[in-house]
Regions:
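Phosphate-bearing ligand-interacting subdomains
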Residues: 38-95, 99
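Small/polar loops that bind or transfer phosphate-bearing groups
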Residues: 9, 67, 174
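Hydrophobic, well-ordered beta-alpha structural blocks that scaffold small-molecule cofactor pockets
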Residues: 1-44, 54-55
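Alpha-helical elements of the RecA-like P-loop NTPase motor core of helicases
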Residues: 15-19, 74-77, 144
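Conserved acidic residues
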Residues: 30, 61-62, 162
Length: 191
C-alpha cells in the first residue's frame, strides 16, 4: 500500500497536483486542508483548515503545499515552513509525463508537473512549482520557493533567485541572473 499525503491548499493548483499524484501512483491522497474551502476537490475531502495539520500528522506523514504562486511566494513559504516545523516529510512530486535528468537535483516539496523538462546539471530548490511544459535547461539554478510557470524557458546557466515568479511563456536568455522575489511577466524575454 502506498504512503499517504495531505495537500495544503484546495484551489486550481491542488487540482493539477491531484492529477499528477494519481498518475505518479506513489502516494494515496489522504485529503486536503484549506482555510477558505470545504467540501471536496476532485473527489477528495477538504478535512478542515491548516489548524488540523498537527492532528493529521499521526495518520499521514507526507505533505505538499498545493497553493499556487502569483506575484508573491509568502503564503507558500509560510505553509512550507509550518509543515517542516510539524515534522512532515515533504517529498518531491514528479509527473511520469515529465523528464528529469538523473544529473539534475530537486529540493524537498517541489512539484514537477506534466511535460516539464529539467536537464542535466540543473538544480531546483525547495518548495518550487515547475509547471506544465516548463523547461529548465542545463546548469540552470532555480532558488527556493519559485514558480516557473507553464511553457516558460529557463535557458542554460541562468540563476533564478529565491521567491521568483516566472510567467507563462516567458524566456530567460542564457546565463542571466534573476534577482530574488522578481516577478517576470508572461511572454517576456528576460535578457
Amino acid at each position: 500500500m502506498s504512503e499517504k499525503i495531505v495537500l495544503v491548499g484546495a484551489g486550481g493548483h491542488a487540482k493539477s497536483l491531484i492529477d499528477v499524484i494519481e498518475l505518479e501512483n506513489k502516494f494515496e491522497i489522504f485529503g486536503l486542508v484549506d482555510n477558505a474551502k470545504n467540501g471536496e476537490v476532485l473527489g477528495y475531502k477538504v478535512l478542515g483548515t491548516d489548524e488540523i495539520l498537527k492532528e493529521i500528522k499521526s495518520e499521514c506523514a507526507n505533505a505538499i503545499v498545493a497553493v499556487g504562486q502569483i506575484k508573491s511566494a509568502k503564503i507558500r513559504i509560510s505553509l512550507f515552513n509550518k509543515l517542516k516545523e510539524l515534522g512532515f516529510n515533504l517529498p518531491v512530486i514528479i509527473s511520469p509525463l515529465a523528464y528529469v535528468s538523473k544529473h539534475a537535483s530537486i529540493g524537498a516539496g517541489t512539484a514537477v508537473m506534466h511535460c516539464a523538462c529539467i536537464n542535466a546539471g540543473a538544480k531546483v530548490g525547495e518548495n518550487c512549482i515547475i509547471n506544465t511544459k516548463a523547461l529548465i535547461e542545463h546548469d540552470a539554478v532555480v532558488g527556493d520557493n519559485c514558480h516557473i510557470s507553464t511553457a516558460s524557458v529557463i535557458n542554460g546557466d541562468v540563476r533564478v533567485g529565491d521567491g521568483v515568479f516566472f510567467g507563462s511563456n516567458a524566456t530567460a536568455k542564457n546565463g542571466v541572473i534573476i534577482e530574488q522575489n522578481s516577478v517576470i511577466a508572461m511572454a517576456n524575454i528576460y535578457k
